[in-house]
Amino acid sequence: MTPGYPLALSLAVSMAVLGSALPAQARQDDPSLFNRQARGELSEYGGARRVEQDLTQALKQSLSKKKAKNVILLIGDGMGDSEITVARNYARGAGGYFKGIDALPLTGQYTHYSLHKDSGLPDYVTDSAASATAWSTGVKSYNGAIGVDIHEQPHRNLLELAKLNGKATGNVSTAELQDATPAALLAHVTARKCYGPEATSKQCPSNALENGGAGSITEQWLKTRPDVVLGGGAATFAETAKAGRYAGKTLRAQAEARGYRIVENLDELKAVRRANQKQPLIGLFAPGNMPVRWLGPTATYHGNLNQPAVSCEANPKRTADIPTLAQMTSKAIELLKDNPNGFFLQVEGASIDKQDHAANPCGQIGETVDLDEAVQKALAFAKADGETLVIVTADHAHSSQIIPPETAAPGLTQLLTTKDGAPLAISYGNSEESSQEHTGTQLRIAAYGPQAANVTGLTDQTDLFFTIRRALNLRD
């Protein structure tokens, strides 16, 4: 299936004709919608093709315009089409596919950009804060903004709306939970690094509690009170509140006083049987960002020419007591589904971006594989449940490119040996600084479940807010 406008038109017609003709739970999805493995030997006639039959009827039957009870939004931070292709080629082979990321039947592309704070003109390369603000609130903002517009005014986000409508809420990330993507659902601050009271006093003084503001990201998170929040960022909880009811207490002590349950390893997470407004759950599994899955050398100048091809290795720091993204996703779903009104859950694979910044292809690939496994968990639940919309996308594109192995590229390069046994050269060349940069290329967005057709064709990142709000029938 090729994403694009003709498909969007045909889907609109199909929606009008079929609507929700079949109850979602009774529908048997055609397996050919999800299996995109190459059908034979790549060297044979038709061997590389991924589709063997006409899928028109299968696509029609997959459509539903009914409201969703639940939404699971999965974000690959920095996961542009190039990052997906790099990871697929290495981990699954040229004819392989990701059973999560590549298996959602309805696909589109969306534009993403931020705005200059002073002029309101487009800034064509967004950061993660402005992008998360865009899909969580429906408002474009400046780079660094968390839940506020270019005038620094807060806007209600999807998690707040879901709570207002009686739904359970969850937020999962492999980053510090105060990082931009998860933070946009937890707080409203004028600068993205205002994790705790110390940084907020210096960087976001108007938000600081001692100045009459709503507080740091972590302090606002504790007030927002999502049912389940899992990831890294434990270090910030050692900071002390400067004002308010909990002045002089650490943020961890405040969380405990507010009735939160805090877990710190996989066994403790597995032991949790319920999480709700009476006792919300916080999982803090690392002081900062959680350890990545795979390690390998960072790219170097002419690394593809001067260094041998390598294979990625498991990260020994990601020990068995640290939950994976898939395990956190499964547990969040298990806990949130108990709410009879449904739930909204955001899941982020955060370090695709962070490893791209570091020009580390193995790190980037492992995090994409991790996200795919989380998507598989979400899809499995949605297929069994029949009332869940699953959406997979990214916040911005990034810097990795696949180049011919023998190319003398001007940037940083690394040669890998793929599952096929073939050389794969990855290049990072958009910055002479220590960190590679985001790019402004439009992004893939794909979906499965009720109202999934609304992601097809060309949309904008802010459309995602309205797509989810409409699907869940969220009201102010």
Curated annotation (Swiss-Prot):
InterPro entries: Alkaline_phosphatase (IPR001952), Alkaline_phosphatase_AS (IPR018299), Alkaline_phosphatase_core_sf (IPR017850). This is Alkaline phosphatase H. Residues 1-26 form the signal peptide. Its EC number is 3.1.3.1. GO terms for biological process: protein secretion by the type II secretion system; protein transport by the Sec complex. The keyword Signal applies. GO terms for cellular component: extracellular region; periplasmic space. Keywords: Hydrolase, Magnesium, Metal-binding, Periplasm, Phosphoprotein, Secreted, Signal, Zinc. GO terms for molecular function: alkaline phosphatase activity; metal ion binding. The active site is at residue 128. Zn(2+) 2 binds at residues 77, 395-396. Its cofactor is Mg(2+); Zn(2+). It catalyses: a phosphate monoester + H2O = an alcohol + phosphate. It comes from Pseudomonas aeruginosa (strain ATCC 15692 / DSM 22644 / CIP 104116 / JCM 14847 / LMG 12228 / 1C / PRS 101 / PAO1). It is an enzyme of class 3 (hydrolase). Mg(2+) binds at residues 77, 179, 181, 346. PANTHER family: ALKALINE PHOSPHATASE. It comes from the Bacteria. Transmembrane segments: none annotated. The keyword Magnesium applies. It is found in: Secreted; Periplasm.
